C-alpha cells in the first residue's frame, strides 16, 4: 500500500512537471523564447514549437521553452522598428509572411539594430490570381495565359471592359501580397512617364481591400460575387489560403491561376516567411537560433506542407486535383528589391492621400474665343471638361473655386466657393453640386481683365499658408492662358514661386490650357517651378486621360 502511494505521488509530480514545462527534464526555470508569427502560419509554427518543447531542448545549461503568438505582419513590423508602441512581451524571434517586412523594419535605425536576418525561410507560398468558378466561366478571364495584365484596365492590356471585371487588391500598405502584386504590375508596365501614368490609372481603378490570407477572408471575398452584390471580381491570394478555402468548400472550389511576371525570370512571385531573430540577451539569442534550425527539420517542414504551405525549398504537399494547383516546384519571379518595394509603396501612399485643391477658373473675355470643336467656345469647352473632371474626384476631396478675369476691387479673383469637402453642404447644395452648377452657368465677363499670374501667386500663397499634410495640395488653373493685365511677367512669377516652394510642404500648380492661343510655354514653366505640370485640352473626352496624367504627376513629382 505504501509503495503504491509513493508510485502514485511520483507519477503525479512527473505529470505536473510535463504540464507546466512541456518536458519531463525541466527542473529549473525555463528559458522562454517568445516567437511572433504571421497570422496565417502561426498555427503551423505552434505545432512545431510543441514538438520542439517536448524534445527537452537546452541552451547554456537551461531548458528552453518556445511560446508562439500570432500577429499581423505589418502591425508587428511597426512595433519592432519603433514606429508604434510595443504591446505585451518582448519578441525574441519573428516570422512575418514576407522578407519585404524585414527590409522595411531594417530601414529604420531601431529596426536595423534589432532585426537580425538568419537567411532561413520557414515556408513558402506562391501568389495566385483568384476568382470564383462562376465569374471565370462568365468572363473567360483565365482562358488566356495568365499574367499580371489581368489586373490592368483594358487600355493597358487588361480584360475587355465588356467583361465587367473589377480588381480587389489587398492594401499594399498592410499586405505583402498586395505590395508584391503592385511591384509586379509596375514591372509589367515598365518605366517612364507613360508607364507612371498607367500605374496611376491602375491604382485609381482597383478597390483596396483587406488581406485575403485565410480561408475565412476568401469566403468574404466570394460573398461579394454572389447575390445581392453579383460583382465580377478578381483578387490576389496565397496558394495556402486557396487550399484552405477549397478544403472548407470542396463542392465549390475557387478558380485560381499562377500569374507569370513580365520581367526575367518569367516566374511566379511568392511569400517566403523568413525567420529573423530579435532577441537581445545572448542566451535567448542562442535558444532562438536553435528553434530556427529545428524549423528546418524534416518534421517541421512536413508540418508546413500539411498546413498547405510549401516547404522552405518550394516543395508542395500532395494537392487535391479539384484545385488544379501545381504539385511541383514553380519557376519563381525575382523578389522585389527594397528600393523597388519602397518606391512603389511611396507612390501608392501618396495616391491614398486625399486631394486639396484650389481651382482658378478663367471667365475673362478670352474664353469667348471659339474652341474649334462643335461650335463650342473655350468657356463652353471648359464647362464640359470641368464637369467631367469633377466627377473623377472622390467625396473626401477638399476643393474651392476662384473665378479669375472678373473685375474685383481688391483682388484679381472672386471667391466663388470656399475650400472644403465636396460632400459638405453649402446652404441647400453640397459643395460638389455647387461647383458643378458654377461650371454649368459661369459666363465670361464682357469687360474683365485677366491678371492670371497675380491670381496664381495669390492662390499659391493661400494654399502654402494653409497647407494640410494629410492631403496632396495643389492650385489647379483652368484658363485660356493669356495674362491680359500685364502687371507681372511670367518670369517674375516663376522666380517668386521658386522662392515659395517648400519640398516638405509641397503645393503644386497644375495648369490646363484650353485652346492654342495662350502662352502654354509660360504655363509649363510656372507649373514646373512647383513640381507640377501643364496640359492642353482641346476635347472634353480627353479629360479622363488628362486627369490620370495630372494625378500621376502629383504622385511622382
Place the predicted regions along the sequence by residue.
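Extracellular/periplasmic juxtamembrane helices and adjacent flexible linkers that interface
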Residues: 1-16, 278-361, 369-380
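Ligand-binding pocket segment of bilobal, Venus flytrap-like solute-binding proteins
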Residues: 185-259
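VWA/integrin I-like adhesion module and closely mimicked acidic/polar interface patches used
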Residues: 481-530, 535-537, 545-550
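Periplasmic-binding protein-like
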Residues: 116-129, 202-205, 250-285
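Extended ligand-binding regions for polar small-molecule ligands
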Residues: 133-149, 265-306
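Von Willebrand factor
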Residues: 157-159, 353-478, 508-519, 543-545, ...
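N-terminal segment of the mature folded domain
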Residues: 24-174
Amino acid at each position: 500500500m505504501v509503495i503504491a502511494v509513493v508510485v502514485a505521488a511520483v507519477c503525479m509530480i512527473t505529470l505536473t512537471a510535463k504540464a507546466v514545462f512541456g518536458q519531463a527534464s525541466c527542473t529549473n526555470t525555463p528559458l522562454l523564447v517568445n516567437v511572433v508569427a504571421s497570422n496565417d502560419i502561426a498555427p503551423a509554427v505552434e505545432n512545431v514549437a510543441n514538438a520542439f518543447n517536448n524534445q527537452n531542448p537546452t541552451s547554456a545549461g537551461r531548458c528552453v521553452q518556445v511560446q508562439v503568438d500570432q500577429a499581423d505582419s505589418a502591425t508587428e513590423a511597426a512595433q519592432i522598428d519603433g514606429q508604434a508602441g510595443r504591446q505585451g512581451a518582448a519578441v525574441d524571434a519573428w516570422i512575418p509572411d514576407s522578407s519585404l517586412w524585414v527590409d522595411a523594419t531594417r530601414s529604420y535605425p531601431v529596426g536595423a539594430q534589432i532585426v537580425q536576418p538568419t537567411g532561413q525561410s520557414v515556408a513558402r507560398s506562391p501568389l495566385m490570381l483568384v476568382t470564383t468558378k462562376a465569374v471565370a466561366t462568365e468572363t473567360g478571364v483565365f482562358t488566356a495565359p495568365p499574367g499580371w495584365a489581368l489586373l490592368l484596365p483594358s487600355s493597358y492590356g487588361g480584360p475587355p471592359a465588356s467583361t465587367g471585371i473589377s480588381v480587389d487588391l489587398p492594401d499594399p500598405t498592410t499586405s505583402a501580397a498586395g505590395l508584391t502584386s503592385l511591384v509586379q504590375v509596375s514591372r509589367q508596365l515598365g518605366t517612364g512617364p507613360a508607364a507612371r501614368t498607367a500605374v496611376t490609372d491602375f491604382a485609381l481603378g482597383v478597390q483596396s481591400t483587406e488581406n485575403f490570407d485565410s480561408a475565412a477572408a476568401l469566403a468574404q471575398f466570394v460573398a461579394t460575387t454572389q447575390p445581392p452584390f453579383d460583382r465580377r471580381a478578381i483578387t490576389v491570394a496565397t496558394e495556402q489560403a486557396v487550399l484552405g478555402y477549397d478544403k472548407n468548400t470542396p463542392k465549390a472550389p475557387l478558380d485560381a491561376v499562377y500569374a507569370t511576371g513580365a520581367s526575367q525570370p518569367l516566374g511566379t512571385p511568392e511569400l517566403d516567411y523568413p525567420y529573423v531573430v530579435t532577441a537581445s540577451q545572448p542566451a535567448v539569442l542562442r535558444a532562438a537560433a536553435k528553434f530556427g534550425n529545428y524549423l528546418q527539420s524534416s518534421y517541421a517542414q512536413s508540418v508546413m506542407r500539411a498546413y498547405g504551405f510549401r516547404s522552405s525549398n518550394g516543395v508542395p504537399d500532395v494537392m487535391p486535383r479539384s484545385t488544379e494547383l501545381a504539385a511541383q516546384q514553380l519557376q519563381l519571379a525575382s523578389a522585389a528589391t527594397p528600393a523597388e518595394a519602397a518606391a512603389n509603396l511611396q507612390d501608392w501612399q501618396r495616391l491614398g492621400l486625399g486631394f486639396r485643391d484650389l481651382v482658378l477658373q478663367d471667365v475673362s473675355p478670352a474664353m469667348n474665343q471659339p474652341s474649334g470643336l462643335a461650335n463650342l467656345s473655350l468657356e463652353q469647352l471648359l464647362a464640359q471638361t470641368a464637369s467631367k473632371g469633377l466627377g473623377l474626384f472622390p467625396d473626401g476631396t477638399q476643393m474651392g473655386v476662384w473665378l479669375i478675369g472678373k473685375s474685383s476691387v481688391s483682388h484679381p479673383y472672386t471667391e466663388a466657393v470656399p475650400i472644403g469637402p465636396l460632400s459638405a453642404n453649402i446652404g441647400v447644395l453640397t459643395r460638389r453640386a455647387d461647383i458643378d452648377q458654377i461650371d454649368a452657368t459661369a459666363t465670361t465677363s464682357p469687360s474683365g481683365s485677366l491678371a492670371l499670374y497675380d491670381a496664381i501667386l495669390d492662390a499659391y500663397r493661400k494654399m502654402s499658408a494653409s497647407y494640410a499634410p494629410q492631403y496632396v495640395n495643389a492650385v489647379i488653373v483652368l484658363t485660356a492662358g493669356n495674362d491680359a493685365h500685364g502687371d507681372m511677367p511670367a518670369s517674375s512669377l516663376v522666380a517668386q514661386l521658386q522662392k515659395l516652394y517648400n519640398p516638405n510642404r509641397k503645393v503644386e500648380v497644375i495648369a490646363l490650357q484650353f485652346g492654342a492661343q495662350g502662352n502654354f510655354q509660360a504655363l509649363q514653366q510656372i507649373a514646373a517651378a512647383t513640381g507640377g505640370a501643364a496640359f492642353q485640352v482641346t476635347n472634353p473626352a480627353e479629360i479622363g486621360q488628362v486627369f490620370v496624367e495630372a494625378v500621376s504627376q502629383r504622385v511622382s513629382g
